Amino acid sequence: GLVFYPESPRSVSLAQAREIAAVVPPFVTLVALFVNEDADTVSSVLREVPVGLIQFHGDEAPGFCAQFQRPWIKALRVRDGMDVAAECALYRDSSGVLLDAFQKGIPGGTGKTFDWRLAQVALPRPWVLAGGLNTENVKEAVKRLQPAAVDVSGGVEVSPGVKCPRKINEFVAAVRAADLELDGSNDE
């Protein structure tokens, strides 16, 4: 994903985003992540970069998210006692939701997990698990929660914003192993 949130160590400029987009292979969906950005800025990025999906990771209302005529997902910061299904229902026009850990004052990328039991509910659409995932815990997370996808950042970095190829490969291998085990258990 392309992070358009200047306060993030993973943030990219519009010029960097265009350079990245130019080398992305076919059938790979570019995701643009925004945090409480204004509509003009979001629209400007969408005009300049071939984004296939928007991820809203702030306090954006459903109507705001839906106005850009592009598939979108909404990140929900899960906190203790939260009714995850009810929060997801507010974003019923989204293509899905991303569940991340809540940490006051930080919209995401905290490296913290949340109480996964809160996500063990019937969610109304495809959902993505985020929040503190790494090579050590992602296999268990996928097997327990069976999300449509997982999202990782800090869990495969050597320092904020700097990815480690070895950690990425190990993370992908752990996800694949969980998927294979789930496929095997579904065949029985």
Describe the predicted segments one by one:
Residues 1-188:
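Conserved N-terminal beta1-alpha1 strand-loop-helix module at the mouth
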